[in-house]
Amino acid sequence: MSGSPPQLDPEIAARLKRTPDGLVPAIVQQYDTGEVLMLAWMDDEALRRTLTTRAATYWSRSRGEYWVKGATSGNTQRVVSVSLDCDGDTLLVKVDQTGGACHTGDRTCFDADRLL
């Protein structure tokens, strides 16, 4: 017996406003301090995987593939909550970050180049 692959809950999918290439920006924040860690991109499947496993899963625009944060680096994100903004076009993913969130190894992607 072969069923169709799991899909994102239709009620959630209907509320998402995606970019033309089917993506939604995800702001990632440390759940207990409010520190903004990074911005990543999700499509319906990345969001479904994140909600199902509580392991932060994103779509890599440069590599054209899914990636689970920390799968190779060990710098994991355990998802505590996911919220949709009032317009339905941005996700807020609150996580418990282990290690650095940035690909450079820094704690956050927003601490290297302060403009003001």
From Swiss-Prot:
Catalytic activity: 1-(5-phospho-beta-D-ribosyl)-5'-AMP + H2O = 1-(5-phospho-beta-D-ribosyl)-5-[(5-phospho-beta-D-ribosylamino)methylideneamino]imidazole-4-carboxamide
One Pfam family it belongs to: PRA-CH
Cofactor: Mg(2+); Zn(2+)
Keywords: Amino-acid biosynthesis, Cytoplasm, Histidine biosynthesis, Hydrolase, Magnesium, Metal-binding, Zinc
Magnesium recorded as keyword: yes
Subcellular location field: Cytoplasm
Keyword Nucleus (UniProt): no
CC cofactor note: Binds 1 Mg(2+) ion per subunit. Binds 1 zinc ion per subunit.
Binding-site positions, Mg(2+): 85, 87, 89
One annotated GO biological process: L-histidine biosynthetic process
Residues involved in Zn(2+) binding: 86, 102, 109
Record GO cellular component, one term: cytoplasm
Family of the protein in this entry: Belongs to the PRA-CH family.
Name of the molecule in the record: Phosphoribosyl-AMP cyclohydrolase
